Amino acid sequence: MRIKDGFILRKIAGSDMVVPVGQNIADFNGIITLNGTAAFLWKILKEGSRPSIMAELLMKYYDVNNEIATKDTEEFVNQLKEANILEYDEDEV
């Protein structure tokens, strides 16, 4: 899975924010503010990844246990799914 084209991460007034661009400006109402962990996961998803790999990277980068990393990753991915910001490879559908 990966972040759909048309969404970019920008630092605005010291905060990490997801901003729609192009056609997504009309389709997506608003912006999303991310904390540091979510911004880290966003950057991974921009290139494409799977939740298990994201959680593993989160454990290494933030020195947290598997339970916390998996929970945080699942919550973030679910929020992006609800916002319709993710796209999937054929083998993930």
Language model region names:
Residues 1-46, 89:
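Acidic, low-complexity/disordered tracts enriched in E/D and polar residues
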Residues 30-93:
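Long, charge-rich, low-complexity alpha-helical segments
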